[in-house]
Amino acid sequence: MPKRTFTKEDIRKFAEEENVRYLRLQFTDILGTIKNVEVPVSQLEKVLDNEMMFDGSSIEGFVRIEESDMYLHPDLDTWVIFPWTAGQGKVARLICDVYKTDGTPFEGDPRANLKRVLKEMEDLGFTDFNLGPEPEFFLFKLDEKGEPTLELNDDGGYFDLAPTDLGENCRRDIVLELEDMGFDIEASHHEVAPGQHEIDFKYADAVTACDNIQTFKLVVKTIARKHNLHATFMPKPLFGVNGSGMHFNVSLFKGKENAFFDPNTEMGLTETAYQFTAGVLKNARGFTAVCNPLVNSYKRLVPGYEAPCYIAWSGKNRSPLIRVPSSRGLSTRIEVRSVDPAANPYMALAAILEAGLDGIKNKLKVPEPVNQNIYEMNREEREAVGIQDLPSTLYTALKAMRENEVIKKALGNHIYNQFINSKSIEWDYYRTQVSEWERDQYMKQY
């Protein structure tokens, strides 16, 4: 949704005119999970005065119990009424930044951390970092108890229409709800895998775009349930089909000028664009754990399913990590194709931006573009042209993250350490599990 500017008086007026009954104060933890404190509208003045307190020790990756008091400072520009609550007492949403009791931003708040990295970008002379995401998701049927099953709601394919695309009605209702909330929807279609869908919305500045991603996920899950469906942003819920990605289309601006566009060069790209790309490539292994944060994420990053496994770039080829779409002028952008929808968008974007700024500050040279299908190249051919692999497991991604100072800087000490600790526990828990596949393979043979 486009950036808006609201005052306290605007919020009071909206709440009264729309007969809002409840306020949902939302924020995001380091795992990308939406958290909220819901209060009756009678608490509006307390909310507007930044006096809403919550227990930070109850939130994954925040603080210890002895330093748990946190305050929610609402971003008034994020005010929106959830359309589906109109019949049962309207609920309005405000996205909040998390503050400590001394009045300073909490260093463990991913949204506040992204703002910190954006300030570093501004110090280099850039004014905006824009993001256009492409989130994908699956729709599964619910059982009679309302629990998700593994039964897909259709067997459609890429760009299919009804009757093959049985998710069309659900997807249309999602789009209508998003538009009612101010989203500018650009495309909505069935994706490659059965039961898989994509809805694209217009790019926005970094913080607004990440807010939009979190709002989008909430709306998709809410409306899907009304259709007796479960929407999941799990990267690879099924074996043998494409997983769900969330490509990040990013661009830097200086005022009204796209800092990536130069009409006088062969590819229409500036030196800044090449340096930014070089920085992303250099730090790609280090930010993979952030952009692909689940054990399951690495089931998607395998050859043969249009997801990148290799660190390279191209102007047209979709097999490398980075693609530069053909649009130029103000639409010039770099597409980072590895990100999946389980990622915390604030953290993923902070990591990608810091990686790109590393390239700009150090004037890194971008390697030659790779225009052949990397999936068809063997290891010797890839090594001959300097193509590295992305990490293939959460374990190797965390190892690469520990070795990368740029990504540590991007996240700050608190988020960096808490994230690595949480994900290391997740990996240890996963590696000790015994799967159905293992029993099928080995029980009888051994």
Swiss-Prot record:
Its cofactor is Mg(2+). It catalyses: L-glutamate + NH4(+) + ATP = L-glutamine + ADP + phosphate + H(+). The record marks 64 as: Important for inhibition by glutamine. The keyword Repeat does not apply. Its main location: cytoplasm. Mg(2+) 1 binds at residues 134, 247, 335. ATP binds at residues 186, 251, 318, 323. L-glutamate binds at residues 242-243, 300, 306, 318, 337. Binds 2 Mg(2+) ions per subunit. It comes from the Bacteria. Its EC number is 6.3.1.2. Residues 110-446 form the GS catalytic domain. GO terms for biological process: glutamine biosynthetic process. Keywords: ATP-binding, Cytoplasm, Ligase, Magnesium, Metal-binding, Nucleotide-binding. The keyword Ligase applies. GO terms for cellular component: cytoplasm. Oligomer of 12 subunits arranged in the form of two hexagons. In its feedback-inhibited form, interacts with TnrA in order to block its DNA-binding activity. Belongs to the glutamine synthetase family. Glutamine synthetase (GS) is an unusual multitasking protein that functions as an enzyme, a transcription coregulator, and a chaperone in ammonium assimilation and in the regulation of genes involved in nitrogen metabolism. It catalyzes the ATP-dependent biosynthesis of glutamine from glutamate and ammonia. Feedback-inhibited GlnA also interacts with and regulates the activity of the transcriptional regulator TnrA. During nitrogen limitation, TnrA is in its DNA-binding active state and turns on the transcription of genes required for nitrogen assimilation. This is Glutamine synthetase. It comes from Staphylococcus aureus (strain Mu50 / ATCC 700699).
